[in-house]
Regions:
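A contiguous, low-structure linker/loop signature
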Residues: 2-42, 58-62
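Active-site loop segments of alpha/beta catalytic cores
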Residues: 41-185
């Protein structure tokens, strides 16, 4: 799965690999002021957004199967902007910075989710691999509220996908009003 569509549209450098998922090669956000330096993602026209949206439209036009798209969750996108390690550490050291970055990334995620819905998606999958780094308490402060904002923004089901060891977080996941859960080990 490609978690770099939103980050690339924000101007972050992406390294594409032949046989693996793309990597974000720089995490430029160190302070809330750095958010203003990011590129305007221009949802739905910037970066590779049009490719994703056209794929959804094509699937809907040529098939009766349900079509859905992937989104980097607000916390995962914030982790790409700051680095997963920095966002995780700063949940304890600088929660105000985390919330500023999360507010910004949530707007991008919500706009992309709405664009996918407008393109005809029957559902979206909110990819949240970074949440497995958090305790349940930190999840409920720094992930859950932003997942809820995405769910509230669209009128289609949102499936929450979380990678890694998630057993400790399952009670938190069920508090999120998502249409489905996809857990990975």
């Amino acid at each position: 799965m490609d978690l770099s569509v939103e980050s690339e549209a924000l101007g972050l450098p992406v390294r594409f690999k032949e046989m693996d998922s793309p990597d974000i090669t720089d995490h430029p956000v160190k302070s809330a002021d750095d958010l203003a330096k990011l590129a305007d993602p221009r949802v739905p026209d910037g970066g590779r957004f049009p490719v994703v949206l056209e794929t959804i439209r094509t699937l809907k036009a040529k098939s009766d199967a349900m079509a859905g798209g992937y989104l980097a969750s607000p916390f995962t996108l914030a982790g790409q902007l700051m680095s997963a390690e920095e966002i995780s550490i700063n949940t304890m050291l600088d929660p105000d910075l985390c919330h500023a970055v999360l507010d910004f990334s949530c707007r991008v995620t919500c706009d992309f989710a709405a664009a996918q819905e407008d393109a005809g998606a029957d559902f979206v999958v909110l990819l949240e691999p970074t949440a497995a780094l958090l305790s349940p308490e930190l999840y409920e402060t720094f992930v859950g509220p932003y997942v809820r904002r995405v769910v509230e923004r669209v009128g289609i089901p949102v499936v929450l996908h979380v990678c890694g060891q998630t057993t400790k977080l399952i009670p938190s996941f069920v508090k999120d009003p998502v249409g489905g859960l996809s857990l990975d080990t």
